[in-house]
Amino acid sequence: MSNTRLPAPSFRATDFQAAFGVSRETLDRLAAYEALLRKWNPAINLVARSTLDDVWERHFADSAQLFALLPEGTRVLVDLGSGAGFPGLVLAILGVPEVHLIESDGRKAAFLREVARVTGAPATVHAQRAEQAEAPPADAVSARALADLSALLPLAARFLRPGGICLFPKGRTAADELTRARDSWTMRVEEFPSRTDPSGALLRLSEIAPRGMQIG
Ligand SMILES: C[S@@+](CC[C@H](N)C(=O)[O-])C[C@H]1O[C@@H](n2cnc3c(N)ncnc32)[C@H](O)[C@@H]1O
């Protein structure tokens, strides 16, 4: 995918295509996803109504920008607290081969299954809490807007293979969350600017281990 800056405002499908260089087929799958989101949202509140007219930027582009941060050869991605599918389901549509979406709300999980069915995305939905769900060892774990880093890391550690990485988009609290998390965890931290949230940061964490334990 190319890495041009996002145009604004009124960011639409054509802008998404220009920004990420995706194929016509991928764009069509995302358009089908958007249509389902609009259809289901009034009944089950998948995303804030105020963001529905801005899905291509606030949700699709915000998720898609993580694709370029995945290590080469990433096969299995586990997305925690997927909600309406951000970022995990977008990353499956963009080409991650095996994505596991973990979402404890049964109605949201049903929506995720329907989007995966309609778009053919390689996503398996687990209608369970992340504390209980099982998935194959993950090359990468993602989560957006689920929890503070100190709560996220033990959840992510349940799924990560040795040497796996975490991708967490964070808002302006990123630095404070990192400081607190470092009390209990050692990790390599890389921070990238968010292309959709000027006050946010994309955290890529690797070499993650509880303090006092050797890295696997
Ligand atoms: C604030 S929403 C964020 C959804 C999505 N990641 C996004 O950014 O749009 C958090 C989601 O996580 C789910 N959730 C909360 N705790 C969870 C847990 N322990 N395991 C799995 N899902 C959980 C909620 O049902 C909700 O859909």
UniProtKB/Swiss-Prot annotation:
GO CC term, one of those recorded: cytosol
Location in the cell: Cytoplasm
EC class (word): transferase
Function: Specifically methylates the N7 position of guanine in position 527 of 16S rRNA.
Catalytic activity: guanosine(527) in 16S rRNA + S-adenosyl-L-methionine = N(7)-methylguanosine(527) in 16S rRNA + S-adenosyl-L-homocysteine
Keyword annotations of the record: Cytoplasm, Methyltransferase, rRNA processing, S-adenosyl-L-methionine, Transferase
InterPro entries: rRNA_ssu_MeTfrase_G (IPR003682), SAM-dependent_MTases_sf (IPR029063)
Protein's name in the database: Ribosomal RNA small subunit methyltransferase G
Keyword match Transmembrane: no
Pfam families for the chain: GidB
Binding-site positions, S-adenosyl-L-methionine: G81, F86, A130, E131, R144
Phylogenetic placement of the source organism: Bacteria, Pseudomonadati, Pseudomonadota, Alphaproteobacteria, Rhodospirillales
GO molecular function: rRNA (guanine-N7-)-methyltransferase activity
Record-linked HAMAP family: 16SrRNA_methyltr_G
Enzyme Commission number(s) of this protein: 2.1.1.170
Entry keyword Cytoplasm: yes
Family assignment from sequence similarity: Belongs to the methyltransferase superfamily. RNA methyltransferase RsmG family.
